[in-house]
C-alpha cells in the first residue's frame, strides 16, 4: 500500500510555540506508520521554515539542531515541499498538510491561505473560519448577530484607549460590574488574559492584554462552569459529549493549562440532560455558522446557579497534548486517537476534492 505523505507543521511565530511542539509530537507518535510517511516541518519563533530530521520521540525545544531549510511551494502545479541544502533546491511531494500551529500566524488563516495557494489538502478549517474564530471580537459579533447566547462584552482598541484612558475606564465601570475578564482579541491558551476585581486590577489587566494585541475584549465574569465540546466533520458534523474543566487556579489560565498540570478534566460533564443537549446543539450550530470544517473545539460557560449556557469561543486547532480535551472527548465518544487522525486526514482530502470542482475560468 502506498503511504500518504503527511507534512505536520509545528512551532510558529506565536506565544503558543512550545505548546504546538508538544501537540505535534503527540499527533506524529499516534499516526499509523503503515499508512503515513510523516514529514515534520517546524517553524522557528523568527518564522524560518525547517525540515526536522531527528527522531519524533526526541522532538523538543532544541529541534532546530536537527533540521534542513525548507518551505512549502505556493506553486499549485508542484504540491510540494522545497528542501534547500548546499544551495540546491529539491522538491518533496506532499499529499496532505496537518497544521498543528496554535495561535497567531498559524491558527488565524495565514498558513491556511498559503496552503490554499499551494493546492495541497490540509487538515482543519479554511481561511475565513480560521480568521474569524481566532479574532474573539469578530467571533463575538457574529455570534451576537446569529442570536447565540453569550455574556456582555466590549471591544477596545489600543490607539483609542491610549488617547482616552479615563473615558474607557469609566465606560467599563458603568457597563460592567466587577469582576471582569480582560483578553487580547487574538490570542490562545489564555495568554494575556486577566481577571480584574477592581479598578487597579483593571488598569493592569488592560496593560497586560495590550502587550499581546492592539485590540482587546472586556467580558463580564460569570460564576460559571467551563464546558467544552469537540466537533468533527465537513458537511456532516459529529459533536462529542461535553467535558468540564475544573481549573486548579481561579480560572483556566495558561499556567493552569500547561504548567502546574493539576486542572481536572471531567468527561462527560455532569450536567442535566437538557443542558447537555442544548450545549451539543449550540456547538453544532456555531460550527456551521462560522463555516468550520475538519475540526474545532467549542467552549461554553454554564452558570452555576441557573444552568444558563453562554458561548465563550471556538478553537480551530485545539490542543492535542496528552492532557488536551479535544482528543479525550473524541475518545470518550468512540473515536480513538489514531482513528481521529485518520478521519481528519480523510476530511482534508474530501474538502480539497470538493474545491477542485470549482471553475476558475469561463472556458470549457
From Swiss-Prot:
Coiled-coil zones: none
Subcellular location: Cytoplasm
Pathway: Cell wall biogenesis; peptidoglycan biosynthesis
Residues the entry annotates as binding ATP: 173-228
PROSITE patterns: ATP_GRASP, DALA_DALA_LIGASE_1, DALA_DALA_LIGASE_2
Domain ATP-grasp: 140-346
Gene3D superfamilies: 3.40.50.20, ATP-grasp fold, A domain, ATP-grasp fold, B domain
Any Pfam family hit: Dala_Dala_lig_N
A Gene Ontology molecular function term of the record: metal ion binding
Gene Ontology terms: cellular component: cytosol
PANTHER family: D-ALANINE--D-ALANINE LIGASE, D-ALANINE--D-ALANINE LIGASE A
Function: Cell wall formation.
UniProt similarity note: Belongs to the D-alanine--D-alanine ligase family.
UniProt protein name: D-alanine--D-alanine ligase
GN (gene name): ddl
